């Protein structure tokens, strides 16, 4: 492949959550459905609903899904997403942070993508509401992009449409993409694996806060 020519295909790192599903709709809008794939990682997460949602959405939208087992990470690190530990703040970041997870996801995605002739990688990381996760920062993504390009001598382009959006703005983007109700109804965010959300974990609270803020804003606009 001519490295100066951008492939007209894209792959989305996909968990079945609000952020990655919004990114999927963004990719579909830009690249067309037939040119988009998703990749999902089984890393030993404490519940299966995340994987089930991702599989259902991919099938429902007619998107090719590849599932990669990276559960070996459980053998070398521990946190509240892969154990039954109580979710809490642990110093400057919550104990739901999985060391190396996004670096691992991007590496495996890049390896797969190169084999498929895909250069554009979408990931739903966000620096605005990132809960203190260091691997959700823009500086990390840019660094990883350079590293992967050098490591594989390939012109990857890592896209982060949500990087500087609040959760309210992420809901607004889903609405602009015509996917608001789909994302609201079909995606899973809860750390505890509760269908429809537990309404108490940090992830649920952030999602609901953003949703309520966006709905209030929309309602205000209609009343003007």
From Swiss-Prot:
Task: Please name the Pfam families in this protein's record.
Answer: QueC (PF06508)
Instruction: Report what the protein is called.
Output: 7-cyano-7-deazaguanine synthase
Cofactor: record remark: Binds 1 zinc ion per subunit.
Q: In which pathway does it act?
A: Purine metabolism; 7-cyano-7-deazaguanine biosynthesis
Q: Which InterPro entries match?
A: QueC (IPR018317), Rossmann-like_a/b/a_fold (IPR014729)
Q: Among the record's GO biological process terms, what is one?
A: queuosine biosynthetic process
Q: Which reaction does it catalyse?
A: 7-carboxy-7-deazaguanine + NH4(+) + ATP = 7-cyano-7-deazaguanine + ADP + phosphate + H2O + H(+)
A single GO molecular-function term is: ATP binding
Q: Which residues bind Zn(2+)?
A: 190, 198, 201, 204
* Cofactors that this protein relies on: Zn(2+)
**Function (record text):** Catalyzes the ATP-dependent conversion of 7-carboxy-7-deazaguanine (CDG) to 7-cyano-7-deazaguanine (preQ(0)).
Positions with a binding annotation for ATP: 14-24
Q: List the disulfide bonds.
A: none
Q: What is its EC number?
A: 6.3.4.20
Judging by the UniProt lineage, the source's domain of life is Bacteria
Q: Which UniProt keywords apply?
A: ATP-binding, Ligase, Metal-binding, Nucleotide-binding, Queuosine biosynthesis, Zinc
Which protein family is named in the record? Belongs to the QueC family.
Q: Does the keyword Metal-binding apply?
A: yes
């Amino acid at each position: 492949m001519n490295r100066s020519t951008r492939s007209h295909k894209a792959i989305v790192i996909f968990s079945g959550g609000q952020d990655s599903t919004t990114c999927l709709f963004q990719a579909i809008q830009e690249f067309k459905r037939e040119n988009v794939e998703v990749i999902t990682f089984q890393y030993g997460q404490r519940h299966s609903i995340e994987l089930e949602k991702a599989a259902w959405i991919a099938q429902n939208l007619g998107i090719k899904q590849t599932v990669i087992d990276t559960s070996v990470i459980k053998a070398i690190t521990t946190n509240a997403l892969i154990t039954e530990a109580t979710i809490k703040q642990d110093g400057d970041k919550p104990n739901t942070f999985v060391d190396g997870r996004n670096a691992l996801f991007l590496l495996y995605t890049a390896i797969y993508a190169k084999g498929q002739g895909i250069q554009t990688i979408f990931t739903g990381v966000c620096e605005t509401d990132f809960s203190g996760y260091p691997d959700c920062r823009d500086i990390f993504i840019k660094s990883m992009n350079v590293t992967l390009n050098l490591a594989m001598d390939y012109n990857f382009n890592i896209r982060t449409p949500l990087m500087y959006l609040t959760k309210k703005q992420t809901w607004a983007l889903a609405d602009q993409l015509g996917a608001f109700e789909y994302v609201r109804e079909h995606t899973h965010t809860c750390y505890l694996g509760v269908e429809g959300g537990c309404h108490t974990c940090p992830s649920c609270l952030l999602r609901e806060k953003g949703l309520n803020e966006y709905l209030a804003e929309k309602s205000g606009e209609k009343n003007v």
